[in-house]
Amino acid sequence: MKLEKDKLYICFHKPQGLLGYLITLRTFGKYAHCEMVLNDYVYYTNPGGARIKPFIYKNYMDIYEIKLPFDVDYFIKQFKKYQGKGYDYWAILLSQLIEIDIEDKDRYFCSELCLILINKLMDDSLTYNLKSIKANQFSPSKLYKYLKFMEIIGEKE
């Protein structure tokens, strides 16, 4: 799959392993992971931390264009603030599987980082239930539903 240059996408993954299936089971959704895609690179966090790698399409991915005006350099600059930060295992367990509100400002999980980056593109103006966004409360499936509801993403690519 070839994506358009200088367009920002969010890529949602269907589960591939035990943790992914547990996340989708607990969150009543179909997605276990998500990441941002820009100019053939993936901007993501997983157990190796926040980093960038070349994008390779796999059949378990659903990709949506982010329908927001944005500047490529600004997006990359925002991501670099998080690059190298660790993966938040505890938040995955506690906030996604058990629903205890826990957050580590130096560690992030996938949907948390994606929502933070999207919110930065909107000058931190996103709200949920009339309150400021708490990105650590969004699973990949909840993020997908929220972005669809807010019309930030459209149809699958």
Where are these regions (language model features)?
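Glycine-rich catalytic cores of cysteine/serine-nucleophile enzymes that process amide/ester linkages
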Residues: 10-69, 94-102
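Solvent-exposed, acidic/flexible segments
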Residues: 28-31, 72, 107, 111
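Generic secondary-structure boundary/loop-capping signal
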Residues: 19-20, 84-87, 135, 140
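Activation targets extended, charge/polar-rich intrinsically disordered C-terminal tails
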Residues: 96-157
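A structural motif
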Residues: 69-93
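Extended, non-globular alpha-helical segments
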Residues: 1-13
